[in-house]
Amino acid sequence: MTDEPVKVVNKWDGPTVKNALDEVVKKILNDKVGWTESHNLMNLRLLISFIGVAFSAFACGYDYYEPFPKSKIVLAVCSVSYFICMGILQMYQWYVEKDCIYEATEVDGKQSRKWAWSSEIKAHDDKYTLSAEFKKEGRSGQGKITKSIGAYIDNDGEIIVPLVKKEVDDLYNRLIRSEQ
């Protein structure tokens, strides 16, 4: 990864800054040798969404071939099923995904660690919290760093990648040391 600054559109917009910092963290972690990113969380989210949309598409298609009075039951069942799928999707995002931005497996010789990285910026706050958690053969560890976004972004609204990389590496090294 190049150490060029990444431009942020509006440094006062919390969600934009969080997304930009998350992308930088993902790029840094993807560049680590021996890491394989896992897309299981996103794949399950897509599957739940696809099932909900499939119910909607079936309802539209069925209504096209069997106009409304005959299709009333199918439309009702498909509509309720769609909203149930969207409720499941929302619960999945709240309780399973949480704020996870990156999942990966690190293979180190014969051992492997499963990593989950998450981030958070509270509304109307300038504190960016980066959390990491790993699991390996019954052992686990977790840690986090909380700093002002001003530590990573200059006055022009550019993310200073080397500073973010240093924080990510420090958090990673701290967790690896605590494991041993």
Curated annotation (Swiss-Prot):
Residues exposed to the Cytoplasmic side: 1-45, 94-180
Family that this chain belongs to:
Belongs to the SPCS2 family.
Tell me the name of the encoding gene: spcs-2
- Xref: InterPro entries: Spc2/SPCS2
Please indicate if the UniProt record lists Endoplasmic reticulum as a keyword. Answer: yes
Q: Which GO terms describe its cellular component?
A: sarcoplasmic reticulum; signal peptidase complex
Name under which the protein is recorded: Signal peptidase complex subunit 2
Say if the entry is tagged with keyword Transmembrane helix: yes
What sections of the sequence does the record tag as coiled-coil? Answer: none
Query: How does this chain assemble?
Result: Component of the signal peptidase complex (SPC) composed of a catalytic subunit sec-11 and three accessory subunits spcs-1, spcs-2 and spcs-3. The complex induces a local thinning of the ER membrane which is used to measure the length of the signal peptide (SP) h-region of protein substrates. This ensures the selectivity of the complex towards h-regions shorter than 18-20 amino acids.
What single Pfam family name could you report for this chain, choosing any that match?
SPC25
Give UniProt keywords alphabetically. Endoplasmic reticulum, Membrane, Transmembrane, Transmembrane helix
Q: Which residues cross the membrane?
A: 46-66, 73-93
Which BP terms does GO give this entry?
Answer: IRE1-mediated unfolded protein response; protein targeting to ER; signal peptide processing
**Source taxon at top rank:** Eukaryota
Function of the protein: Component of the signal peptidase complex (SPC) which catalyzes the cleavage of N-terminal signal sequences from nascent proteins as they are translocated into the lumen of the endoplasmic reticulum. Enhances the enzymatic activity of SPC and facilitates the interactions between different components of the translocation site.
Please give the organism.
Caenorhabditis elegans
Q: How does it sit in the membrane?
A: Multi-pass membrane protein
Topology: which residues are Lumenal? Answer: 67-72
